[in-house]
Amino acid sequence: MKVIVLKAVAAAAVLLMAASSHAAPTLVRDARVFDGERVHERRSVLFDGAVIVDADFRGAPPAGARIVDGAGRTLLPGLIDAHVHAFRYLELPLLFGVTTQVDMFNSVQIMQELKTAMTAGKNGGRADMFSAGTLATAKGGHGTQFGMPIPTLATPGEAQAFVDARIAEGSHFIKIAWEEGHGAHRMNSLDAATVTALIEAAHRRGKLAVVHISTLAHARAALEMGADGLVHLFIGKDIAAADADALARLAKAKRAFVIPTWVVLESMAGVKTDGVLSDPALAGLLDREQRQSLRASYGQSPMPEQLVAPKAVIAAMHRAGVPVLAGTDAGNAGTQYGISMHQELAALVAAGMRPGEALAAATSAPARAFGLGKRGRVASGYKADLVLVEGNPLVDIASTRRIVEVWKDGESTEPLRVRQRERVARENAEPGMAPVTLPADGRISLFTKEKLASPFGMGWSPTHDGMMGGASSATLELLPLDAGAPAALAVRARVVKANFPYPWAGLAFGPGAQPMQPANLSAVKTIAFRVRGDGQRYALSMMSRGVTIPATVHFIAGPEWKEVSVPLSRFPGIDPALLTMIGFNAGPEPGDYRFEIADVRLLDK
């Protein structure tokens, strides 16, 4: 058996002893208790401060204890999301019962700040986080596209120094990105020798090494190299049963775990299941911006057939006894912190896991796999991170959504939930921004020698990847007017290979009064424009508030003028009432580009 010594467990022990002042003891009485592994039909649980004092309490309640009625309810350990990117909304997971997040890539500053707060026992109002910090990737590889400079590596000889630097920063484990991209969107990636060297370097320091993969071949190879876990599965229209079973047997033999991240795979496949958003008990805890991220999607059109392979692999892993952990990849399009866990649990059950097994995948299993100390269980001496729900999620997994109360470090999060509900209710009651009045002809490209104007907003300007440290560039030139025709603009773009996967350059329209300020364009149903150019492919992109990656529709700029008309419904997750940017861009392939654009219109039909 492969043994990895995880040194960060000590932090949890310090936290459990740290409370210098806390509320009165709490007794949850006569509840059904799922302890992270088994169900107990009727138990009382006493916790005091940050610690569960007695997971099977009997007798008279302690003097002054708060009594919570558990009849007809189920008490669960605080849920653990085994795959997130927790760069914002650190309190949001608590509202949905997620008390711990395993972070797969984050800024060192956020990681260190939360680690310090957790060690001091002062992280009660936020979900705890155990992070990989900076992931291991190649120059221009997966993880370099977010605009913050990160160290990268290119050869096996750099692996040990890279791992040692991450450990010195406070990384709990090492995450490795082995991602070559797909189709036309290829990207730099670590080679197999460097991935192997990183895994071995992590193990030499007693750290787990987990690998981001997106193909069956890489999944097999990573397991053969000794990866402790796969932090994604992969989409695909089909997979032979023999291949799924062989992968599961390999994972079992290597004692590895798997985090399917079904929710983000749905996003990649363009499939939206609105169960959590249509549940008022859950959606009422998200503001408009937070809901928008959940509605977003990486896939531009539904391709449910792409989910056949991951569902089959989850089932095979489960049959083989491989630890399957519940993780959402929250922070990405189609996800949201906390709430997406309930969708992930439902997906695991749909793939063949029993509800109790899915609950273990979100509690005791990730705590054990990542060495998170005394959490993930309802047991004496364990951390008092608890969730009380109505009904029986051991029978109906959707009962996890019927949250009665959440405790973090023994403190009720109910005040936080009440404040959030009140804030969301106020936002929903407010009229919001007044809709922009569109011109009668819809035209927003008012190009003249004096100004690249528009009837509202900031107008038009060149855009490029310089904000991310790229070297791409764009120049704009007003073309001589054809008689009776709207003015046209020539866009010359040079896209330069960068240290991130998607360099770009082109033309942007800002609908708000300030950069990236939203405008209410809810009346818009279609964007139309005329274009001609060098025959290359370009991207029409849109962003709205709360969306971190643009939604994109591609078009070809051929040698003759042509009309392009795109319904806004083709931009998944974009809220026209909060639109922040419209772009016409070249890239990501390096090279010189030229297109001409005219008569850009926003139409209400």
Annotated model-derived regions:
Residues 405, 409-437, 555:
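Extracellular/periplasmic ectodomains of large secreted or surface enzymes and adhesion receptors
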Residues 429-605:
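Beta-rich carbohydrate-recognition modules and glycan-binding surfaces
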Residues 70-75, 90-209, 246-289:
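Divalent-metal coordination cores built from histidine and acidic residues
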Residues 33-76, 193:
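Histidine-rich, glycine-flanked metal-binding segment
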Residues 18-20:
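N-terminal signal peptide c-region/cleavage motif recognized by signal peptidases
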Residues 33-44, 57, 336, 354-359, ...:
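Acidic, glycine-enriched loop/beta-strand segments at the rims
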Residues 161-183, 236-351, 425:
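Active-site neighborhoods of metal-dependent hydrolases
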